[in-house]
Structure formats: structure tokens, C-alpha cells
């Protein structure tokens, strides 16, 4: 077991487990209906969670935008400059195994402190990392009460802004969708089930008119020159590809009259 899981191995030595009072950085919340209790810890640093985090990535459910590599890089290069302080919530079972990770942060403003997801505007999807055993410990009906307890344990915040949350995380329902105040965005993302081959999928999803327009677009593209798919291999090629991408997107943003996200620090 990693040091972080050993830390919670003997539940009787944790103050929250003996007197049931919530402390600043750890709290034991009992869930009803004879379900196991959940130990919640709050972490203000990302790096010490690396081993537990990456292990949960491999065995549980999450999106690419909740991986340790993504979140730690964002916090290091962007979050710190924006004044966002990590307030990462980890839920543990009675054996010291991680049940879930909520990569949250506190954005400190002049008038108020805002609770939000780490990753900011650069993540397409915001969600918890969930162990495959999560639903055995906390049911959808129980999660709102657990969330209320979590918020009491988190650092002071006045506003909660949780956006871009998918209905499902991997094969599991997203427990965050059980909370009050959740509203579907008018530009909600869509998901689709892929088939064994492209032709079957394309034939099912596109009408004859759409296919005709696709062929016309392809012919116009070919008039500009040969079309090929190239995967950059070396570091220099990858950087050059990103530079070209950002340059082209900047031109597109200017033409559309929208803010250029690449101008941000």
C-alpha cells in the first residue's frame, strides 16, 4: 500500500473515526442503510497524491481531463497564476483504498471564494475519478448528503461553479448529477456508440444528402493538394504542429470575432 493509504489503514486512530467529529483535513461520514463508512480527506497539494491518483486512473473510471498528468500540468502552469488553490477530495473505504477523487480547487477572488474544478476552461469534461466499487459504498440517493458533508470540510468558499459535467463517467453514472441546481447546457455534448467498422457506422449515421455533401467537401479539399494523415513523432515535430495549429485557430477566432484562448497566459 502507498503511504497515503497506510495513513488511513487503522481507522481507530483517526479522530474522526472515534468521536465522529469532522476535522479540517479528514472526516469520517457514515452512510445509512448498513453501507460502509466513507473517510474523506482534503488535500492542498497534488504531487503527494500521484501514486493513488494514477492507480485509480488505471483501475477505475475517469476522463482524460481528470488524469494526474493533465491536472498537475494545468495547476502548475495555469492554476497557480490564476490564484487557484487545490482542494482535492479523496474518499477512502474502510481498508484504505481510494473510492473516488474530486479534483476541486478554490479560486480566491476579491469579493468571494469560488469552488470549481481544477482544469479550468481547458477541460472538455469535468467529473470525479471513480473506483469500480464506488456504487457499492455510496448510492445515488446518498451522494447529496455526502456532498453536503464534503462541502463543510472544504476550505471556505461562497460560490460553487461546477460545469461541463457528463452524465456518465466511464461505465458509471456520474454522482455529481444527483446534486440540486444541476442544469443541462443548451450546447450539451453528445455521445455515440461506435461500431466494428467505419462503413457500418457512417452508413447508419449519415443520410444520402449528407454523404453527397461530404463527397463535395472532399473533392474541394483535394483540389488544394494531396491529403494525408501524419502523426508527428519527434519533439520538434510535435511543437511545430502545435504552433501551426494555434496559428490557424487564432486566424479562425479573429474571423469569428471571438476571444483567442491562446492569448491567455
PLM region descriptions:
Residues 120-125, 185-187:
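Short, solvent-exposed loop/turn segments at the edges of secondary structure
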Residues 106-108, 129-132, 154:
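Generic hydrophobic/packing signal
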Residues 1-34:
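Short, intrinsically disordered terminal tails adjacent to the first/last structured region
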Residues 36-116, 165-188, 197-265:
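A conserved beta-strand-loop-helix scaffold within acyl/acetyltransferase catalytic domains
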Residues 121, 128-137:
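A short, internal acetyl-CoA/4′-phosphopantetheine-binding micro-motif in the GNAT/acyltransferase core
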Residues 137-194:
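Non-catalytic accessory segments adjacent to catalytic cores
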Residues 130-133, 192-196, 233:
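Short beta-strand-to-loop capping motifs
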Amino acid at each position: 500500500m502507498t503511504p497515503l493509504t497506510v495513513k488511513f489503514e487503522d481507522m481507530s486512530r483517526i479522530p474522526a473515526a472515534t468521536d465522529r467529529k469532522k476535522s479540517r483535513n479528514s472526516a469520517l461520514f457514515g452512510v445509512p442503510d448498513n453501507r460502509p463508512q466513507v473517510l474523506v480527506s482534503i488535500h492542498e497539494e497534488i504531487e503527494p497524491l500521484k501514486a493513488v491518483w494514477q492507480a485509480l486512473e488505471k483501475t477505475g473510471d475517469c476522463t482524460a481531463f481528470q488524469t494526474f498528468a493533465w491536472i498537475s500540468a494545468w495547476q502548475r502552469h495555469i492554476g497557480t497564476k490564476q490564484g487557484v488553490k487545490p482542494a482535492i477530495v479523496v474518499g477512502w473505504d474502510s481498508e484504505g483504498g481510494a473510492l473516488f477523487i474530486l479534483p476541486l480547487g478554490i479560486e480566491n477572488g476579491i469579493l468571494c471564494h469560488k469552488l470549481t474544478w481544477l482544469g479550468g476552461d481547458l477541460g472538455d469534461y469535468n467529473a470525479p475519478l471513480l473506483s469500480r466499487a464506488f456504487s457499492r459504498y455510496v448510492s445515488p440517493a446518498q451522494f447529496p448528503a455526502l456532498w453536503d458533508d464534503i462541502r463543510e470540510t472544504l476550505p471556505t468558499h461562497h460560490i460553487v461553479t461546477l460545469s461541463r459535467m457528463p452524465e456518465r463517467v466511464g461505465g458509471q453514472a456520474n454522482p455529481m448529477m444527483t446534486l440540486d441546481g444541476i442544469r443541462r447546457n443548451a450546447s450539451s455534448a453528445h455521445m455515440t456508440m461506435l461500431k466494428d467498422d467505419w462503413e457500418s457506422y457512417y452508413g447508419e449515421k449519415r443520410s444520402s444528402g449528407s454523404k453527397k455533401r461530404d463527397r463535395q467537401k472532399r473533392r474541394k479539399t483535394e483540389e488544394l493538394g494531396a491529403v494525408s494523415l501524419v502523426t508527428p513523432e519527434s519533439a520538434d515535430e510535435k511543437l511545430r504542429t502545435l504552433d501551426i495549429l494555434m496559428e490557424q485557430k487564432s486566424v479562425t477566432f479573429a474571423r469569428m470575432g471571438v476571444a483567442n484562448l491562446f492569448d491567455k497566459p
